Amino acid sequence: MVYKYDFLIIGSGVAGMSYALKVARAHKGKVCMICKTSLDEANTSFAQGGVASVTNLEVDNFDKHIQDTMIAGDYISDYKAVKQVVTMAPEQIKELVEWGVNFDKQQDGKFDLHREGGHSEFRILHHADDTGAEIQRGLMEAVRNCPDIDIKENHFAVEIITQHHLGARVTRRTPYINCYGAYVLNPETQKVDTYLSKVTVMCTGGCGAVYQTTTNPVIATGDGEAMVYRAKGTVADMEFVQFHPTALYHPGETHPAFLITEAMRGYGGILRLPNGESFMEKYDKRLSLAPRDIVARAIDKEMKKHGLDHVCLDVTHKNPEETKHHFPNIYAKCLSIGIDITKDYIPVRPAAHYMCGGIKVDLNGCSSINRLYALGECSCTGLHGGNRLASNSLIEAVVYADTAAKHSIEHVDEYDFNEKVPAWNDEGTLTNEEKVLITQSVKEVGECMSNYVGIVRSDLRLKRAWDRLDLLYEETENLFKRVKVSKELCELRNMINVGYLITRMAIERKESRGLHYTIDYPVHAYDKK
C-alpha cells in the first residue's frame, strides 16, 4: 500500500504530538502520526520531575537558567540553542496549559515550583510526581480530538526513504540527501507499506533499552538515530548518555526501572549508604543536589568500593504528610514492595536515563537530510552539551516542535511527493521461526553496553564493546537479509547501530567531559599542560 501525507511524524511523545497539533491547525495539508505502540506509551509518560521554565521573575531570570544549563553541559552546550529554549519556554508553557495540561499551583494561584539538581532557583513546574504522564494525557486528548491528524498505532517505521532507494549512490559526503517518507510495517498485514511525505519528522524518543537497566520503557531502542545514521545523516554527541542516579532498586524491574525523581533530592532527600552514612560531601559541595553525572559517578564508586548493589535515599526526616502529598506515586510504588518512604530508606542505583546526543539539528529542528526534521530526545540540538540539566528535556521538545512547525509550514509547498519510490522488496525472504536468535542478541547488547560503555569507561572496555558489537552487527545484518521484517528484528538492528555510535564516539573523545568519564583521560582536553 502507498499512503501520501504532507506531514509524516514518526513518534508520539511530547515532541511528536506538539508538532502534530501545531501543523494541523495551520491546515497546510494532511498530517499522519506513526506510533510504535499505543499513543499513550511514549517515553514522555515516564518523566516524573517536571518542566524547567523561568516563571517567578521576582527571584529568577533567563540569564540564571542559561548559566545553569551551560554549567551542567560542561560548557560545550550550543549557546544559541540554550538561549532559544530558555527564552521561549514561558510561552510554550502557556500553550501546554491551553491544550489541557495541568501543573500544580499554590493557594495564591501561582505555579508550585520545585528545585532540582543543578538549578540555582525554584523553576520546575510539575504535576505531583507524574508530570510526563500528565503532559502525555493532555496532549493525547487534544490529538485524539483533532480530526486533521491520522493516528497509526502499533505501526513501526523500518527505514526513511531517500534517493538511495531510487538507485542513487548515497554516501556521507553526498550533498542534498532528500527524505521522501518512510517504509512502515503494518502489524495487521505484516507487510511493509510506503508512506510518501513532503515533510518527515523524527520524534522517536530515547535509546535507554540498549542498556541492561534503564528508566526508559522497552520501546526506547534508538530507532530514529539508527534510521538516520543508516540514511547517511549526521548524528552527534552520542557518547553523552545520562544515567539517572536514583532508579528504584528492585531486581526484576529493569525495563523500565522505576524512577525516583530528582525533585526528591531537591525536597531534601539525603543519599546514604545502607548503614546510614552520608557520602556526597566527599564528592561535591552541593551534596545530593549536585548534577546527575557527579551523583551517578559518586554512587557507582561507593557501590564498587563497598561491594553494594544499591545505596539509599533518605526522606524519613521530612514531614510524612508533605512527602505523601508531593510524591504520591513514589510513595504508593515503594509501599507496594514493602517500603514506607516516610519511615524507611529507599534503595536506589543508577540506570540509563537520557541520551543527550542524537540526530544533529539546527535551531529549526532541520537535520542534515533535506525535508527531515528531528525533535525531542532522538535529536541533538546542542542544548544539553555534555550533560542535560534536570527537567530541560520536555521543554526542549515543545520549543523545537514550535520552531520546526513554523519552518515546515513555511516550506512545505516547495516540495512534491516522489512518485518514483519503489515498494518494499522482500522477495526471497523467509518467515523467521527462530526468535531466540533475536532475544539472545538483545540480551547481549544490553550486557555489552552496561559492562563496557557505562558510567565509567576505559579504552580497554570500549575496544571490547566495539568487537562484540561488530560480531552482533554481522550476524544481525545476515539475518535481516534472510528473513521477513519484524518489529523485534528491526529493534535489534537499531540497538546495535546505536550501541556502535555510542561506543565509537566514546572512543573518539580523548578526554573526560560531562557524562563521558574515562579513566584513561580523566580531565578535560584543554586542562592538560
Task: Briefly describe each language-model feature range.
Residues 1-6, 19-22, 29-30, 38-40, ...:
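Glycine- and aromatic-enriched mobile tails/lids
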Residues 159-171, 175-176, 180-189, 339-383:
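FAD-site-proximal beta/loop scaffold in flavoenzymes
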Residues 77-90, 123-141, 152, 214-222, ...:
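Short beta-strand to alpha-helix junction loop
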Residues 12-14:
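Glycine-rich Rossmann-fold phosphate-binding loop(s) that bind the pyrophosphate
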Residues 97-191, 196, 203, 247-251:
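Conserved redox-cofactor binding core of oxidoreductases
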Residues 39, 227, 233-340, 346, ...:
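An anion/pyrophosphate-binding glycine-rich loop and adjacent beta-alpha core
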Residues 37-70, 74, 242-246, 255-256:
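Conserved N-terminal glycine-rich FAD pyrophosphate-binding loop of Rossmann-like flavoproteins
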Residues 72-112:
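Rossmann-like flavin
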